[in-house]
């Protein structure tokens, strides 16, 4: 009985022993990240690298408003379709917006030659100076400039024509050969547009131009073409059996362009001195234009984001994140948010020896929990926490900086004859997009694995730091905690935390308590062994007595007969 009471007393004493535990921060975060080995790992802190939202608006770009073409397209705007008169004064923009029903382009039917290339050129233009290249009143004294109108380009119910071109016809009964030149002195490239008319019949050719064998010649240092009218019967489009083909060229500073014709010339009236050098572009969008500002615009809406990736739209204008196909790119910065023991990454650094994170420790990532006669409490290890924060912050910033190549990505332009090239280009673009997406996802997976293992190793290092100080002055409990063999007040606890624990000071007390506890263990083991033997012997005796009594009873009533044979 004395041994039993002594064992119970020692057990009670052990439960009240001073302890210190190494642990890590936990919170109520539900953020999840993916690693190379796992998916949806809950972590205490993380940063999102993928922008997936927009405001649904078309905004000004860095304070400069876009040019909304409305129901007009680029051709109608530059040629001066009468339906696009609201755009006549437009001369600057951050980007150009066409809508899905931008149908007002060339009002007189015909082909706009190299139209897609012209749209591509506008991607680097943000403003222009519109000017009269050949003034209407003085440039064509021997020709008619007022009768060239058509019902196909009507305005307010009356026949009209393009605002930036002149349809030159015969004056009286003659169309003398014309020759007109312009030398570019604007200090920048000048966009010049003109056209060539192809009548449906020879009678219309003579009615308009008098000359049956007319030609149009256009030449500069880089451009030289001669056009002859193609007179042929054609089905009517917009009420017209004739056709007009539209042409353009860029005239360098100091270069001269000369127009020579004996008929069929749709002469330039206005030209455009282009201001190049900034990223612009043409997008097709039905989103509304609002009084807002952004650094990145997509057809779906504006992105106000400094993240390195986005999955909103591949077409972007401005300083935009790189488009990827991913649906999630989240980088871990904190630790696993672990409520219970589970596997911990490649290193397995604290697998099975830390039961779970502490929500009570809010001022650091790693730290201590102690309990002694003076009370208990949490304390973060500021040095290891700060080193980890600095390292991870630098890593995240480096990843974002390397991957955050912001740029404009506008769609490439192809005409109907280049569909095979367009399909090939799309395949190439899709291939690059797949590579970008794969690289981004792999980078995040690897960095997340490294970050979580980095945290694990930091907790392990903190544990080893405590263990190396305490040595045999404390017992490892196997859950990240140490039980002291001596009294450890708050000053003692603080010395363990800051690495100044005085091992010799507590060695003698620890030795005595350790030997006493070990002795109790041995004595209690002997008591329990004696009890076990006694119990076994007593049970055997009871069994034998019972068997003997049953045998005697059965012999007395004849149920059991015993015969002894010699």
Curated annotation (Swiss-Prot):
<dbReference type="GO" id="GO:0019064">
    <property type="term" value="P:fusion of virus membrane with host plasma membrane"/>
</dbReference>
<dbReference type="InterPro" id="IPR001364">
    <property type="entry name" value="Hemagglutn_influenz_A/B"/>
</dbReference>
<keyword id="KW-0564">Palmitate</keyword>
<dbReference type="GO" id="GO:0046789">
    <property type="term" value="F:host cell surface receptor binding"/>
</dbReference>
<keyword id="KW-0472">Membrane</keyword>
<keyword id="KW-0325">Glycoprotein</keyword>
<keyword id="KW-1165">Clathrin-mediated endocytosis of virus by host</keyword>
<feature type="disulfide bond">
    <location>
        <begin position="296"/>
        <end position="320"/>
    </location>
</feature>
<keyword id="KW-0261">Viral envelope protein</keyword>
<feature type="disulfide bond">
    <location>
        <begin position="488"/>
        <end position="492"/>
    </location>
</feature>
<dbReference type="GO" id="GO:0075512">
    <property type="term" value="P:clathrin-dependent endocytosis of virus by host cell"/>
</dbReference>
<feature type="topological domain" description="Extracellular">
    <location>
        <begin position="18"/>
        <end position="529"/>
    </location>
</feature>
<keyword id="KW-0946">Virion</keyword>
<dbReference type="GO" id="GO:0046761">
    <property type="term" value="P:viral budding from plasma membrane"/>
</dbReference>
<keyword id="KW-0449">Lipoprotein</keyword>
<feature type="glycosylation site" description="N-linked (GlcNAc...) asparagine; by host">
    <location>
        <position position="104"/>
    </location>
</feature>
<keyword id="KW-1164">Virus endocytosis by host</keyword>
<feature type="lipid moiety-binding region" description="S-palmitoyl cysteine; by host">
    <location>
        <position position="565"/>
    </location>
</feature>
<keyword id="KW-1168">Fusion of virus membrane with host membrane</keyword>
<dbReference type="GO" id="GO:0019031">
    <property type="term" value="C:viral envelope"/>
</dbReference>
<dbReference type="GO" id="GO:0016020">
    <property type="term" value="C:membrane"/>
</dbReference>
<comment type="function">
    <text>Binds to sialic acid-containing receptors on the cell surface, bringing about the attachment of the virus particle to the cell. This attachment induces virion internalization either through clathrin-dependent endocytosis or through clathrin- and caveolin-independent pathway. Plays a major role in the determination of host range restriction and virulence. Class I viral fusion protein. Responsible for penetration of the virus into the cell cytoplasm by mediating the fusion of the membrane of the endocytosed virus particle with the endosomal membrane.</text>
</comment>
<dbReference type="GO" id="GO:0055036">
    <property type="term" value="C:virion membrane"/>
</dbReference>
<keyword id="KW-0732">Signal</keyword>
<dbReference type="GO" id="GO:0020002">
    <property type="term" value="C:host cell plasma membrane"/>
</dbReference>
<keyword id="KW-1032">Host cell membrane</keyword>
<keyword id="KW-1160">Virus entry into host cell</keyword>
<feature type="transmembrane region" description="Helical">
    <location>
        <begin position="530"/>
        <end position="550"/>
    </location>
</feature>
<keyword id="KW-1162">Viral penetration into host cytoplasm</keyword>
<keyword id="KW-1133">Transmembrane helix</keyword>
<dbReference type="InterPro" id="IPR013828">
    <property type="entry name" value="Hemagglutn_HA1_a/b_dom_sf"/>
</dbReference>
<dbReference type="GO" id="GO:0019062">
    <property type="term" value="P:virion attachment to host cell"/>
</dbReference>
<feature type="glycosylation site" description="N-linked (GlcNAc...) asparagine; by host">
    <location>
        <position position="40"/>
    </location>
</feature>
<feature type="topological domain" description="Cytoplasmic">
    <location>
        <begin position="551"/>
        <end position="566"/>
    </location>
</feature>
<protein>
    <recommendedName>
        <fullName>Hemagglutinin</fullName>
    </recommendedName>
</protein>
<dbReference type="InterPro" id="IPR008980">
    <property type="entry name" value="Capsid_hemagglutn"/>
</dbReference>
<keyword id="KW-1015">Disulfide bond</keyword>
<keyword id="KW-1043">Host membrane</keyword>
<keyword id="KW-0812">Transmembrane</keyword>
<keyword id="KW-0348">Hemagglutinin</keyword>
<feature type="glycosylation site" description="N-linked (GlcNAc...) asparagine; by host">
    <location>
        <position position="28"/>
    </location>
</feature>
<keyword id="KW-1161">Viral attachment to host cell</keyword>
